[in-house]
């Protein structure tokens, strides 16, 4: 909740442009859907006057077929909303710790969906309309020889992308368009006569490097 409040109250991001993902559960390993996160997100969006509908997508393939469906909270499987050092639950050796995560995405409404990534867009689509700007990992499980056990002591591990949040603040899908890089691009323009905004993609890539 602190991160959401930071984004909306301190940075003044439009909550209508924020979408979140949660863990849809793993029936094979008997790990339930992250209902706690769903309920928390619903309450946070409700405070902003937003009805946060839950949409179960599970996979990117399903997401590209069904699309947004007026959703605000989207559940995906372990490929997108689970973290451990070994990857998804089935790859975790006995003794390994892990847990579901919840991710926050910003929507760039000026970016049109590219159909090469699927018929319809959704938060985990690769077309660039949505950008993950932060996530919280809930370290609450330990893998035993034949099952997943709840940890007695659990914690939340947060991660956020500074450049990504800055990109959201200026509503630009290009993370290099924020103020941090402008003086560098201006120096390149003066020295080499190359303007970042007018450059072709290969030139932009060279300027970023």
Spell out what each predicted region is.
Residues 1-209:
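Structured aminoacyl-transfer and RNA-binding surfaces used for tRNA recognition/handling
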């Amino acid at each position: 909740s602190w991160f959401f409040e930071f984004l909306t109250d301190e940075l003044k991001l439009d909550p209508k442009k924020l979408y979140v993902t949660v863990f849809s559960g793993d029936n094979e390993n008997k790990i339930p859907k992250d209902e706690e996160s769903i309920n928390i997100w619903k309450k946070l969006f409700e405070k902003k006057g937003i009805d946060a509908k839950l949409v179960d997508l599970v996979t990117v393939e399903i997401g590209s077929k069904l699309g947004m469906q007026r959703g605000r909270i989207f559940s995906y499987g372990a490929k997108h909303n689970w973290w451990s050092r070994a990857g998804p639950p089935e790859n975790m050796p006995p003794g390994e710790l892990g847990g579901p995560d919840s991710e926050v995405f910003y929507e760039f409404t000026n970016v049109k969906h590219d159909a090469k990534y699927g018929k319809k867009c959704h938060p985990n689509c690769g077309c660039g309309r949505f950008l993950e700007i932060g996530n919280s990992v809930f370290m609450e499980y330990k893998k035993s020889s034949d099952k997943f056990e709840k940890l007695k002591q659990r914690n939340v591990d947060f991660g956020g992308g500074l450049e990504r949040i800055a990109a959201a603040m200026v509503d630009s899908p290009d993370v290099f368009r924020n103020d941090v890089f402008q003086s560098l691009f201006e120096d390149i323009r003066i020295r080499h006569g190359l303007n970042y905004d007018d450059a072709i993609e290969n030139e932009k890539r060279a300027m970023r490097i």
